[in-house]
């Protein structure tokens, strides 16, 4: 059934297809229909960050930037849903076209640029949703906020989403916001993490609950850089790391249509690179910080490979575009088989 829907959607431009898909999934969620469209995955309860997940397979940030289809995605069987990236103020993102399919490689290139309707709009959508499961909210900085003031944007978003999120992801790894990835390293990372940690403590007192903080990192790092990031996360007492965002590499898509477009590459070509980062992180963290793995999961076994590499949870995005809701069940089944 999804193969037919995909064939029709792929006749549209990628961004039009994306918007239509969100509308349809959102409408199906409001009507309670999405659960009828696919066989539900097996129950596989998983505890991470002090949270209880129905299963360890989640929706990665970026598909539902504004929280328009939270109930719809949950009904498809995801064990958790992450929305965003959201910024303090609405922003249009980069000029179109900015989203490209590379179907021969089961890949996507995007240079969206954190297009979103702002954190206040997203919170209205969160409040309207009926979903009671684990909800992650991914936060970023506005395009026109200088990098040296990026901390202010993250704290603004954290203040606003804290009471409504199960966990909050801090996106310092999108390649489509100039200067953003510099926040992953050195004093910039240390200062950001310390500010977030202090604010988390204040908000815990204010709201009477501790909301975990996860940091989302890029795949384009050496083992030494990854080790330094791991050390910084441990030093700041972060709650999780999400590995990884999209890559600037074009390995695996050379010569394909759109391969030379600027932006981050996701899907199958980033799989090995992302899994390697997970392995390095796992070795450095030694179980002291959970890893949420994302990048290139297009078959169930790819999810199991990431768990075997050291992840506690996985997320999918591009694989969902190419394989549809059945991939969720396949990933849950593969992880369940690994645990036996």
UniProtKB/Swiss-Prot annotation:
- GO CC annotations on file: cytoplasm; plasma membrane
The record ties this protein, via CDD domains, to: DHOD_2_like (cd04738)
One Gene Ontology term of the biological-process aspect is: 'de novo' UMP biosynthetic process
Name of the protein in its database record: Dihydroorotate dehydrogenase (quinone)
In alphabetical order, the GO MF annotations are: dihydroorotate dehydrogenase (quinone) activity
Q: Which residues bind FMN?
A: 61-65, 85, 138, 171, 216, 244, 267, 296, 317-318
The enzyme's main class, written as a single word, is oxidoreductase
Positions that bind substrate: 65, 110-114, 171, 176, 245-246
Q: Which Gene3D superfamilies match?
A: Aldolase class I
The function of this protein is: Catalyzes the conversion of dihydroorotate to orotate with quinone as electron acceptor.
Instruction: Tell me the pathway.
Output: Pyrimidine metabolism; UMP biosynthesis via de novo pathway; orotate from (S)-dihydroorotate (quinone route): step 1/1
The record's EC number reads 1.3.5.2
Quaternary structure and partners: Monomer.
List the catalytic residues: 174
How would you describe this protein's topology in the membrane? Peripheral membrane protein
Coarsely, its chief localization is: membrane
Pfam families cross-referenced by the UniProt entry:
DHO_dh (PF01180)
- Source domain of life is Bacteria
Q: Which family does it belong to?
A: Belongs to the dihydroorotate dehydrogenase family. Type 2 subfamily.
Cofactor note (record): Binds 1 FMN per subunit.
Q: What is the annotated localization of this protein?
A: Cell membrane
């Amino acid at each position: 059934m999804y193969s037919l829907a995909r064939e029709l959607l792929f006749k549209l431009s990628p961004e039009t297809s994306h918007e239509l898909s969100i509308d349809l999934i959102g409408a199906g969620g409001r009507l309670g229909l999405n659960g009828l469209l696919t066989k539900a995955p097996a129950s596989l309860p998983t505890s991470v960050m002090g949270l209880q997940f129905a299963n360890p397979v989640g929706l990665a940030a970026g598909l539902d930037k504004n929280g328009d289809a939270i109930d719809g995605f949950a009904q498809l069987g995801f064990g958790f849903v992450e929305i965003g990236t959201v910024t303090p103020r609405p922003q249009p993102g980069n000029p179109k076209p900015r989203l490209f399919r590379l179907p021969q490689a089961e890949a996507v290139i995007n240079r969206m640029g954190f297009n979103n309707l702002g954190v206040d709009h997203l919170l209205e959508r969160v409040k309207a949703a009926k979903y009671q499961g684990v909800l992650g909210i991914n936060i970023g900085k506005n395009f026109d906020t200088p990098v040296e003031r990026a901390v202010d944007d993250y704290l603004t978003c954290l203040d606003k989403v804290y009471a409504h999120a199960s966990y909050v992801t801090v996106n310092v790894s999108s390649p489509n916001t100039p200067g953003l990835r510099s926040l992953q390293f050195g004093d910039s990372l240390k200062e950001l993490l310390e500010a977030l940690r202090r604010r988390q403590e204040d908000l815990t007192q204010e709201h009477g609950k501790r909301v975990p903080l996860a940091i989302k990192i890029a795949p384009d790092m050496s083992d030494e850089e990854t080790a330094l990031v791991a050390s910084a996360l441990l030093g700041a007492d972060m709650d999780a790391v999400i590995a990884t965002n999209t890559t600037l590499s074009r390995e695996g898509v050379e010569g394909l249509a759109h391969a030379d477009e600027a932006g981050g590459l996701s899907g199958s070509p980033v799989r090995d690179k992302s899994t390697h980062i997970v392995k390095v992180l796992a070795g450095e963290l030694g179980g002291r910080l959970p890893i949420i793995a994302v990048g290139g999961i297009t078959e169930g076994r790819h999810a199991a490979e990431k768990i075997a590499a050291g992840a506690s949870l996985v997320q999918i995005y591009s694989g969902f575009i190419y394989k549809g809701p059945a991939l969720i069940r396949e990933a849950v089944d593969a992880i369940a088989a690994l645990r036996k």
